[in-house]
Design a protein with these regions (language model features):
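Short, structured "edge-of-domain" segments at secondary-structure transitions
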Residues: 1-198
Length: 198
C-alpha cells in the first residue's frame, strides 16, 4: 500500500516493499504478508475497514492501481494500512488521539465497497497503520509527538469487534483536539524481539 492509496501484490515473502518503484510524489505506506487466497483487509484514516481478494490485486511489477477504483471511502479519507492472515488472528487498531483495541480479522472483513466502521475516531483524529498481535505476551509500543514511548503487554488491550477502544496513551483532550500532541507510531513486539525507533 502506498501513501497515495495505490496497491499491488508480489509473490514470495522475500520482496522488500520499500525498495519498489513508486509514482513521483508517492511512497511506501504499509505492507503485510499473507497468501493469495486470503482477503486483503484495508483500514482507512476514518476507521472504516474494506476487503479485497488478494489474488485480484495487480502485480508488483507495475505501479499498482488506486484502491479508490475498487472501494468507496468517505471524502478526505486515506488508506492507513492493510491486514491479512488467519481469520482468528488479532490486530491492534489505534487512533492517533490515543485510543485503541484489538479485533479479530474475521470481524473486519466486509463485502461492501463503502466498507464498515470498526474504529470510532473523534473528529480531527486519524487511524494509524494496524499491527498484528501474535500473543498476549507480546508488547504493545506506542510513541507520541513529544518523544515519549510506552510499552505494555498486549493482554492489557481489550478485544472488541468495533468501537472506540480504551485509552492506551494519555493525551490531554485539548492537545489532541488542536493536534499539538498525538500518537505517531505503534508496534507490537514479540517476546525476545526488539524495536528500533527513528
Amino acid at each position: 500500500l502506498s501513501t497515495g492509496g495505490w496497491v499491488r501484490q508480489a509473490k514470495g515473502h522475500e520482496i522488500d516493499p520499500r525498495s519498489l518503484q513508486y509514482k513521483t510524489g508517492d511512497g511506501f505506506q504499509h505492507s503485510v504478508r499473507g497468501m493469495a487466497l486470503q482477503p486483503a483487509v484495508f483500514v482507512d484514516t476514518t476507521g472504516r475497514s474494506y476487503s479485497v481478494p488478494a489474488h485480484t490485486l495487480p502485480s508488483a511489477r507495475g505501479l499498482g492501481e488506486p484502491l479508490s477504483g475498487r472501494l468507496n471511502p468517505p471524502d478526505g479519507a486515506k488508506f492507513a494500512g492493510v491486514m491479512m492472515g488467519d481469520p482468528e488472528g488479532l490486530w491492534l487498531l489505534v487512533s492517533d488521539v490515543g485510543y485503541g483495541f484489538t479485533a479479530r480479522l474475521k470481524d473486519l472483513i466486509t463485502d461492501r465497497r463503502a466498507g464498515k466502521t470498526v474504529l470510532s475516531v473523534p473528529e480531527g483524529g486519524l487511524v494509524l497503520p494496524p499491527a498484528s498481535v501474535s500473543s498476549p505476551d507480546s508488547l504493545v509500543c506506542v510513541a507520541n509527538t513529544e518523544g515519549r514511548l510506552l510499552a505494555f503487554p498486549a493482554r492489557d488491550v481489550p478485544e472488541m469487534p468495533k468501537g472506540k477502544g480504551n485509552k492506551l496513551f494519555n493525551i490531554p483532550s485539548a492537545k489532541a483536539a488542536s493536534r499539538e500532541e498525538l500518537l505517531v507510531g505503534v508496534a507490537v513486539i514479540d517476546k525476545g524481539g526488539s524495536l528500533i525507533v527513528h
